């Protein structure tokens, strides 16, 4: 139980850190992305172009997969991965569907929220540990 809780907490941290690392890397490779990223972090204004926003969607997806993997490795139980995926899904749904729907393009809101739970549970750790009963 303790390992599961630690796995979920570390998974959330991995999710945030993973996205920011990918975003910083993208900003280093694409200077115009960096300009829009700074505008988002300073003013909360979403000015990313469609290709930039699609790169954000890929970064969120990769961060969710990585977070699920980290949580599964630490917890050694598939249940922790599902809890993490559920928490991320609920958090993103509240942020993108209730609080900030009008701040983002509709397709971006859907692109962030819909794959959150499936992406977080696609980690091989979930299936390997679940089959062995560990």
How does the language model describe each region?
Residues 1-134:
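Juxtamembrane/disordered regions of integral membrane proteins
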């Amino acid at each position: 139980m303790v390992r599961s809780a630690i796995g979920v907490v570390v998974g959330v941290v991995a999710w945030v850190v993973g996205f920011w690392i990918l975003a910083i890397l993208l900003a280093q490779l694409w200077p115009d992305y960096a300009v829009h990223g700074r505008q988002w972090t300073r003013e909360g204004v979403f000015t990313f172009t469609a290709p930039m926003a699609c790169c954000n969607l890929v970064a969120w997806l990769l961060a969710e997969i990585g977070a699920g993997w980290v949580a599964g490795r630490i917890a050694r139980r598939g249940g922790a991965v599902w809890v993490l995926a559920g928490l991320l899904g609920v958090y993103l749904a509240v942020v993108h569907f209730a609080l900030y729907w009008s701040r983002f393009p509709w397709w971006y809101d859907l692109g962030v929220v819909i794959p959150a739970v499936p992406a977080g549970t696609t980690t091989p750790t979930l299936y390997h540990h679940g089959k062995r009963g560990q």
